Amino acid sequence: KPYVDTTFTDPYGTAVGVINPTEKFKVVIEAHADEISWFVNYITNEGVIYLKRNGGVDHQIAPAKRVLIHGKKGVVKAVFGWPAIHTRMSNGDQKEQNPKVENLFLDCGARTKKEVEALGIHVGSVVTYEEGFDELAHDYYIGRAFDNRIGGYMIAEVARLLKENNKKLPYALYVVNAVQEEIGLRGAEMIARRIKPDIAI
């Protein structure tokens, strides 16, 4: 807010900061605010949690990953499981299975469906991978949802640097952090129809 002239959000939740809102020529710089995730789809009587994908999450990397289930009572830790290796390889005629959405599940430590529900977990709860940030060799960094977080940081930095360096633009600049990118660019599409930019990056 301190770096733009005005702000607004749309009904989807996309956040917009505008510099020079009265100028007719409109430029959008956009990042996205959402991240890949999973949804709780089914809870068995034994407390095993099955999921559906939300966005472009890769199920092949899921086995043994730690996750956070965002439930009604807060965050619950869990871990991805899938059939143990000795059960996957017990049939000599059959090739070892690959991870599939259908054979992946979450274990949150609960022993029954009631125990899962008592933790605040319900069908529709969002599941994200555990937080984590690290530095690799040669100044490379890794972390959860880095694509959108770095993108959001970059567009905010543009606004900050323009303000702090007292740069005047001959056009309206819309700094847009859109939602629903991971499920089909919906937020960007809706806000573009509202702003009607001449240029979008």
Regions found by a protein language model. Give the residues of each.
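N-terminal hydrophobic/helix-forming segments and targeting peptides
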Residues: 1-201
